[in-house]
Regions:
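C-terminal catalytic histidine-bearing segment of alpha/beta-hydrolase fold enzymes
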Residues: 126-130, 134-194
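Short glycine-enriched nucleophile-adjacent loop
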Residues: 90-101, 107
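Short beta-strand immediately N-terminal to the catalytic nucleophile in serine-hydrolase-like folds
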Residues: 83-85, 110, 130
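Proline/glycine-enriched tight loop/beta-turn segments at coil->beta junctions
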Residues: 1-9, 122-124
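Active-site machinery of serine-nucleophile hydrolases
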Residues: 7-9, 13-64
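Gly/Ser-rich "nucleophile elbow"/oxyanion-hole loop immediately N-terminal to the catalytic nucleophile
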Residues: 1-5, 51-88, 101-103
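Active-site nucleophile loop of the alpha/beta-hydrolase fold
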Residues: 50, 108-116
Length: 194
């Protein structure tokens, strides 16, 4: 019944506590946890594991190569590739998206941050950022600076602040079906063939 169908893809970047070589760690939070609870999750979910001694923003070329290979090998719709991550993965989301904005139909960084001077690279990419205002690990100003910089250059950005919430802004975000509906509302234009 799904022959010939091309699926939307979500690339999920985990937090620092899930680095290493044990894939079971990656399943503790975020998209992998949602997929385990929802067998009919309507996306191809890609959840790589960051090596122990590095951070996602240092893995940007590797992540790009991974995405390229997945799009080439599998039935993925290249106009519906979405990116999200929490904490270290939120930083990685900003870094990967600002480096390769043409890849993504929409992104959702959670309790992360980036380089505000690079934010305008995302002015054509819908962004929905999330952060708890009581986060003791990654201060909310990290997200605020990126959101403000993106707004200044006319970007399509939403910002959800969870009042009284600490570092775990991701459980509430990933358990909310509205996020996935929002992702699916966004699609990149088809690339014209030359």
């Amino acid at each position: 019944e799904n022959a010939g169908r091309h699926w939307p893809l979500i690339l999920y970047l985990h937090g620092i506590g899930e680095r290493g070589e044990t894939l079971a760690q990656v399943k503790r939070h975020g998209i992998p946890k949602v997929v385990a609870q929802q067998p009919d999750f309507p996306f191809v979910a890609v959840s790589p594991q960051c090596p122990e001694e590095t951070l996602w923003h240092q893995q940007v070329p590797t992540l790009k190569a991974l995405l390229d290979e997945i799009v080439e090998r599998y039935a993925v719709d290249p106009t519906r590739i979405y990116l999200t991550g929490n904490s270290m993965g939120g930083f990685g989301t900003w870094a990967l998206a600002t480096a390769y904005p043409e890849l993504f139909a929409a992104i959702a960084p959670i309790c992360g941050g980036g380089e505000p001077e690079q934010a305008c690279a995302l002015k054509e990419v819908p962004v929905w950022a999330f952060h708890g205002d009581a986060d003791p690990v990654v201060d909310i100003t990290w997200s605020r600076k990126m959101v403000e910089a993106l707004r200044e250059c006319g970007g399509d950005v939403r910002f959800t602040v969870y009042e009284g919430v600490g570092h775990d802004a991701w459980t509430r975000t990933y358990e909310n079906p509205t996020l996935y509906t929002w992702f699916l509302q966004h699609k990149k234009p088809d690339n014209p063939r030359s």
